[in-house]
Amino acid sequence: MEFEAVRISPGKYRGDALLVGLFQDGPEPALALAALDAAVAAVVLEVISEEEFKPKSRQKLTVRVGGDTGLRKVVLVGLGEQAKYKPESLRQCIGEGARTLKAIKATTAGVWVPPLGEGGEEATVEALVEAIRLALHEDRRFRSKKSDSEENGNSNNGGENKLTKVSLVVAGEGDYAAAVRRGNILAEGTIFARELVSAPANYVTSVTLAEQATAIAEANGLECEILEKEDCERLGMGAYLGVAQGTDLPPKFIHLTYKPAHSAPRKRIAIIGKGITFDSGGLSIKPAKGMELMKVDMGGAAAALGAAKVLGQLKPDIEVHFIVAATENMVSGHAIHPGDILTASNGKTIEVDNTDAEGRLTLADALVFSEKLGVDAIVDLATLTGACVVALGNDIAGLLTENEELARQIRAAGEASGEKFWQLPMEESYFEGMKSVVADMRNTGSREGGTITAALFLKQFVEKTPWVHLDIAGPVWTEKQKGYTNRGGTGFGVRTLVRFVLAQ
């Protein structure tokens, strides 16, 4: 799909369809649509009146125009109230509009919306490209029939996309090519993460995840180091390797590094993504119902690698390390037992109270490794606790840190990206419940406050570096199609990480 920004009057656009955004509390339709061709505007206004269309957020109306206007259809989409018009509200509304373009089988389309107040037309163009690319993404990798005609329309995202060219109507002068490029790159990184999360565990393993990381590095000029089991043993990564010993697949400790090519980095950041490619629970086995979704337990790794793919192309003057301790948590004669004691790479000992609290064990060694790199800040993302989903639901990630500046930066990047975070307290007294009689700590505490105790466990493996933990267990997957989000893996975290780094 090709995007272009065109400096023309919307009335001059010619193509299959024109997608037009209208405010709920904006000018009367006759005034708002005055820039359209007179014949087109007359037809559209008549249908608006007949249908009593009110442009509330994400409301849509399709009007057939035809004739000799050079335009087949006009698609109206409500943008809601002007005071709430921000990049994310625009993305959500245009995502719905893009689905309509797909449904009417448009091959060429124009898009005409009011510019955003912050960032102007360049920010508007970037948001439009993101929204349309993400809304129209469909994962057909595992279907025997790859086209909609072969499937007779049996699609999980409204049929096959015919759209090949999108013209974004702008009024002023700007670096719109750069904005289109940024929007495309952000969408591609998010789609990459979506597809990693959605793929089953017989396709995404520690081995294939390492192969994907290597490919990202080769394509984007990143350094790539894959530590094998023997390397991890030399580094004393007993917590990570304890989890990995239950699977027949080799552990792969992935370390990608992006470095600015032409200047010394202003900052150095480490991003850690939890990389459990399938979580059976180990000997503390999970119930069968819902276990098929445990393929998503590498959602943090997907976000980290998606961000690596994006930042490798945007090339900020920040050094970024992307770290994934990849393995799966399986049941076998080699798997760790409840009650086993593991020694992490910082020398601390852990009594394994529950083998299904394995992600924090792999993150422990990843955190120690990251801090030894001498970075200025560490961010970890993990589908870590069901407790976070109970507390915050499926749309909001948990944020835990003792560094308020890091919390502020993540929240700001999340708001700009349409990804929601809610800060939970690092209540130190809760760690009392994780103390062990036989080791330095247990890997679980009481049922209450499970997201907080998980973060307090991770804190034991960070000494001085500013660090923030993001529990993305809820928003990494969705069963709903809404705005620009489709059913399946969401790619949550990619765009927040990218904007967090770019804002340093």
From Swiss-Prot:
GO terms for biological process: proteolysis. One of its GO terms (cellular component) is cytoplasm. Its EC number is 3.4.11.1, 3.4.11.10. Mn(2+) 2 binds at residues 274, 279, 297, 358. The active site is at residues 286, 360. Mn(2+) 1 binds at residues 279, 356, 358. Gene3D superfamilies: Leucine Aminopeptidase, subunit E, domain 1 (3.40.220.10), Zn peptidases (3.40.630.10). Pfam families: Peptidase_M17, Peptidase_M17_N. SUPFAM superfamilies: Macro domain-like, Zn-dependent exopeptidases. Signal peptide: none annotated. Its main location: cytoplasm. InterPro entries: Leucine_aapep/pepB (IPR011356), Macro_dom-like (IPR043472), Peptidase_M17_C (IPR000819), Peptidase_M17_leu_NH2_pept (IPR023042), Peptidase_M17_N (IPR008283). It catalyses: Release of an N-terminal amino acid, Xaa-|-Yaa-, in which Xaa is preferably Leu, but may be other amino acids including Pro although not Arg or Lys, and Yaa may be Pro. Amino acid amides and methyl esters are also readily hydrolyzed, but rates on arylamides are exceedingly low; Release of an N-terminal amino acid, preferentially leucine, but not glutamic or aspartic acids. Its cofactor is Mn(2+). The keyword Metal-binding applies. Keywords: Aminopeptidase, Cytoplasm, Hydrolase, Manganese, Metal-binding, Protease. One of its GO terms (molecular function) is metalloaminopeptidase activity. Binds 2 manganese ions per subunit. Presumably involved in the processing and regular turnover of intracellular proteins. Catalyzes the removal of unsubstituted N-terminal amino acids from various peptides. PANTHER family: CYTOSOL AMINOPEPTIDASE (PTHR11963:SF23), LEUCINE AMINOPEPTIDASE-RELATED (PTHR11963). Belongs to the peptidase M17 family. HAMAP family: Cytosol_peptidase_M17. This is Probable cytosol aminopeptidase. The gene is pepA.
